[in-house]
């Protein structure tokens, strides 16, 4: 199993980044809930835009993550879950640092035991469809931030910060 690219002790604190960058900080306004076993994580961004369909999420987390963070814009829908224990486990096995879901997750009790950062709006036990609709590696926007593939994302208990590095 690949080693994660970062651990909680090596992640730069989002508050420290905010102090360093100042008023121009790209800080996500959306108040996400932490579901993963890793509260602090960082990595290069990969994105998916989908709506109640998680096939692209499943496929992407099945690829080598190399310490990246998958940002999923699910249109803020909590009608179906886009990530559950099996898909998140694929992310752990493939070296992903974290997943941000602008939508819902499920299997939350198990997600808390996995060594991966997972933040989402909430939970829903209903699974999503898997038709493959959506887009990958395109800029997505929510919470006042545009998440651009290849940029750096930092996440901890205080929030989510994005910066070009």
Curated annotation (Swiss-Prot):
This protein's UniProt keywords: Lyase, Metal-binding
Cofactor note: Divalent metal cation.
One Pfam assignment: RraA-like
Reaction(s) the record says it catalyses: 4-hydroxy-4-methyl-2-oxoglutarate = 2 pyruvate; oxaloacetate + H(+) = pyruvate + CO2
Segments passing through the bilayer: none
InterPro entries named among the record's database cross-references: RraA, RraA/RraA-like, RraA/RraA-like_sf
Listed EC numbers: 4.1.3.17, 4.1.1.112
SUPFAM superfamilies, per the entry: RraA-like (SSF89562)
Binding site for a divalent metal cation: 107
Alphabetized GO MF terms: 4-hydroxy-4-methyl-2-oxoglutarate aldolase activity; metal ion binding; oxaloacetate decarboxylase activity; ribonuclease inhibitor activity
Sequence similarity: Belongs to the class II aldolase/RraA-like family.
Oligomeric form and interacting partners: Homotrimer.
Function field: Catalyzes the aldol cleavage of 4-hydroxy-4-methyl-2-oxoglutarate (HMG) into 2 molecules of pyruvate. Also contains a secondary oxaloacetate (OAA) decarboxylase activity due to the common pyruvate enolate transition state formed following C-C bond cleavage in the retro-aldol and decarboxylation reactions.
Name under which the protein is recorded: Putative 4-hydroxy-4-methyl-2-oxoglutarate aldolase
Species, as recorded: Nocardia farcinica (strain IFM 10152)
